[in-house]
Amino acid sequence: MKSGIHPEYKKFLIKVESDVFETMSTHPTGEILMDVDFRKHPAWNKDSGNVVNQSNKSVSDFNKRFSGLSFGGKKEAS
């Protein structure tokens, strides 16, 4: 391998809530602080519900504006 062209491969910390995971990476900072817990994502955890941050003004505005919009899905029984 040619020397001097590859980034340094070093210990990398992933911090989620009170948990810390250690792995290896070329990321320059050496750590990442996650504000959303990846373990609670609905793609692999159906009990977690919606993980969208409702405090985000853009998301809240979108939900208010389009709350009654139907995309032709199944109709709810009344």
Curated annotation (Swiss-Prot):
Q: Which GO terms describe its biological process?
A: translation
> Which InterPro entries does this one have?
Ribosomal_bL28/bL31-like_sf (IPR034704), Ribosomal_bL31 (IPR002150), Ribosomal_bL31_sf (IPR042105)
Q: Which UniProt keywords apply?
A: Ribonucleoprotein, Ribosomal protein, RNA-binding, rRNA-binding
The cysteines joined by S-S bonds are none
What superkingdom heads the lineage?
A: Bacteria
Ribonucleoprotein: present as a keyword of the record? yes
Q: Which GO terms describe its cellular component?
A: ribonucleoprotein complex; ribosome
**Which Pfam families does the protein's record reference?**
Ribosomal_L31
Question: What GO annotations for molecular function exist for this entry?
Answer: rRNA binding; structural constituent of ribosome
Q: What does this protein do?
A: Binds the 23S rRNA.
Q: What assembly does the database describe for this protein?
A: Part of the 50S ribosomal subunit.
Family the entry assigns: Belongs to the bacterial ribosomal protein bL31 family. Type A subfamily.
Q: This protein is called what?
A: Large ribosomal subunit protein bL31
Q: What is the phylogenetic placement of the source species in the record?
A: Bacteria, Pseudomonadati, Pseudomonadota, Alphaproteobacteria, Rickettsiales
